[in-house]
Regions:
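Substrate-recognition/cap regions that form aromatic- and gly/pro-loop-enriched pockets
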Residues: 297-418
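Membrane-interface helix-loop junction between the first two transmembrane segments
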Residues: 20-40
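Membrane-embedded catalytic scaffold of the fatty acid hydroxylase/desaturase
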Residues: 44-59, 78-241
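Hydrophobic transmembrane alpha-helical segments in integral membrane proteins
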Residues: 1-15
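Loop-to-helix transition at the N-terminal end of transmembrane alpha-helices
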Residues: 10, 33-50, 333-343
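Structural signal for membrane-spanning alpha-helices in multi-pass inner-membrane proteins
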Residues: 26, 49, 61-65, 98, ...
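Transmembrane alpha-helical segments that form the membrane-embedded catalytic/substrate-channel core
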Residues: 15-24, 88-103, 161-174, 185-191, ...
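Cytosolic/stromal cytosol-facing helical appendages immediately following the last transmembrane segment
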Residues: 119-124, 167-309, 361, 397-425
Length: 425
């Protein structure tokens, strides 16, 4: 937990700088692929994902060390070859997990957030799920466990393998020659994120494209078929927390409304997007039919509104950085404070992304955020030990949360109506 938090203190600013560089580069080249609100939504999703992992808001079932203890045929040392084997094993497992997430209704809920952006850029790589409360990833690492790959090797290689998937989420890099034969490139992954009929459910590989070539899911990017990004049932929100549970909520409602008990049971394991015929007829859900002519979810708003949202997210990044840098200190004050801090981060994200959506309940969420934060400060006399670093910081934070609430109420009244839509293509 603490080690991962320290890694993120380096990774987060690095990713943010690369995202901003892509925005600047696209602007300079006259090919801007990054919209402000979409980028903030993506970054906010990344914040919720890493916060969940750092504070431990999940349950691991059948962990890798369990399989290693019971299935390892040999005991091996952590040599460079073992690290290489671990990397390949993780990549192989990643391919099949990724494929399952696309194929079955229930598993799609854990991946929908990653495809929810209607753009394709570095920021959308940070759209990672928070809906997976129970982790069963280790089941797919059985080959590594059988061959005795040490658990600490997996622990080191896993985040590196994840971070290595960031760079190819861009439209600014074309074909890459011979590398296209064995590595996942931006061209390959653009196909994967596309909703064109020719591209959908292709290129599941994460680092080595060889898995798609071996298992029949490979598709080249075609010059005459420009990829169109997003999902066929658009999420129509900037709120990453709502996106994370939008699909499973639809499944729950469909299962409830279905007349057939067989449909109520099988809906969870049917192909992604399947709905009982009677439910689909009675409760239709919008789905994109022509991918070249649909309306993108757009931010609208003026420059002050956009600036305010940026200020909100930047302030949250500072608060999250404090959490990651001081996990040990916060736990020493009270072990429950880590979970409390994590819940606060989620409410913070929910509040300002509801404002981004022009949701009329945004001030209520902002009030809840302010009440929770000020309540923590009044009850403990501090902000999780922060006054030991900056004297009086708790009073500054009280002022900030009150100001934030006031401006949110003002903007909610000023920005009338739902977010406007603009033509996509």
């Amino acid at each position: 937990m603490e080690a991962y938090g320290k890694i993120l203190l380096i990774a987060m600013p690095a990713f943010l700088l690369l995202v901003l560089f892509e925005k600047w580069y696209g602007w300079r080249k006259g090919f801007d692929t990054v919209r402000n609100m979409d980028m903030i939504s993506s970054l906010s999703s990344g914040i919720t994902n890493v916060t969940k992992d750092v504070v431990g808001l999940y349950l691991i079932v059948l962990s890798y060390p369990f399989f290693l203890r019971h299935l390892a045929l040999v005991e091996v040392k952590a040599t460079w070859l073992v690290y290489l084997i671990a990397f390949v094993a993780l990549d192989f497992a990643g391919y099949w997990i990724h494929r399952l997430q696309h194929v079955f209704n229930f598993f799609w809920n854990g991946h929908i957030i990653h495809h929810s952006s209607e753009e394709y850029n570095l920021a959308c790589a940070l759209r990672q799920s928070i809906s997976g409360i129970v982790k069963t990833f280790a089941v797919f690492l059985l080959p590594a466990a059988i061959f005795g790959v040490p658990a600490n090797v997996i622990a080191i290689v896993a985040p590196l393998h994840l971070f290595a998937q960031f760079w190819y989420h861009t439209r600014h890099i074309g074909r890459m020659g011979f590398l296209e034969l064995f590595l996942v490139t931006p061209s390959h992954h653009r196909v994967h994120h596309a909703i064109n009929p020719e591209y959908i459910d292709k290129n599941f590989s994460q680092i080595l494209i060889i898995w798609d070539r071996l298992f029949g899911t490979f598709q080249e990017e075609q010059k005459n078929i420009p990829p169109v990004y997003g999902i066929t049932r658009p999420v129509a929100t900037w709120n990453p927390i709502r996106i994370n549970f939008q699909h499973v909520w639809l499944l729950i409602k469909d299962a409830w409304h279905a007349h057939s008990w067989w449909d109520k049971l099988r809906i969870w394991f049917m192909p992604t997007g399947w709905r009982p015929a009677d439910v689909a007829a009675q409760y239709p859900v919008y789905k994109i039919v022509d991918v070249y002519h649909f309306e993108k979810y757009d931010e609208g708003g003026n420059s002050f509104f956009a600036t305010w949202i940026w200020i909100q997210m930047t302030t949250l990044l500072l608060l999250v950085s404090y959490l990651f840098a001081n996990i040990g200190l916060i736990k020493s004050l009270d072990s429950s404070y880590i979970i409390l801090y994590g819940i606060f981060v989620f409410i913070y994200v929910y509040a300002y992304t509801e404002l981004m959506d022009r949701n009329k309940y945004a001030p209520i969420w902002e009030a809840l955020k302010a009440a929770m934060a000020i309540g923590i400060i009044i009850y403990t006399g501090d902000w999780f030990g922060a006054s030991g670093f900056v004297s009086g910081i708790q009073y500054v934070l009280i002022g900030w949360f009150l100001l934030s609430f006031a401006i949110t109420v003002w903007l909610s009244k000023k920005e009338q109506g739902p977010t406007e839509l603009s033509a996509a293509h």
